[in-house]
């Protein structure tokens, strides 16, 4: 009996992981979480719909880099590839001295469980080369997202 329960639990976990990966499928930016999510000096946070329901957010994933100096070229390259391929629309960018400091992008909508979800990527370089990279999906629109920030 324990084996059956364990097998069902593993199948459910794999299904949830597959659905999450599918949500970011086709994005170069998705590889940022895979590449740096468990790296020393990086904090990864993932919150589910249960934690975020009052904000109309279904999924929140973020990476906080203590020092993004080494990772920054890869992150910027992924963002540029996604922009060039038309997989995301620029909502706002702040560039200072030729360097991207803040960016808000909207991704194509996602159909999931009879819902149409909006998806966003947020990126900000802070003081002392710290940085935050965020992926959000939910029912909120871009104006609501900006109001939350």
Model-derived features with residue positions:
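Bacterial Sec-dependent N-terminal signal peptides
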Residues: 1-29
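Early exported N-terminus immediately downstream of N-terminal targeting peptides
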Residues: 26-78
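Compact soluble domain cores
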Residues: 64-100
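Surface-exposed, polar helix/loop patches in the mature regions of secreted/periplasmic/lumenal proteins
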Residues: 85-148
């Amino acid at each position: 009996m324990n084996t059956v329960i364990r097998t069902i639990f593993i199948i459910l976990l794999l299904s949830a992981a597959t659905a999450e990966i599918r949500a970011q499928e086709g994005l170069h930016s998705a590889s940022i979480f895979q590449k740096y999510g468990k790296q020393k000096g990086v904090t990864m946070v993932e919150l589910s719909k249960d934690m975020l329901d009052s904000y109309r957010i279904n999924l929140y994933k973020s990476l906080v880099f203590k020092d993004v100096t080494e990772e920054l070229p890869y992150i910027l390259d992924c963002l540029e590839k996604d922009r060039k391929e038309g997989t995301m629309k620029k909502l706002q960018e702040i560039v200072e001295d030729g360097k991207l400091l803040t960016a808000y992008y909207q991704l194509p909508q996602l159909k999931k469980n009879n819902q149409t979800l909006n998806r966003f990527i947020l990126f900000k370089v802070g003081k002392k080369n710290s940085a935050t990279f965020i992926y959000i999906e939910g029912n909120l629109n871009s104006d609501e997202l900006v109001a939350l920030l």
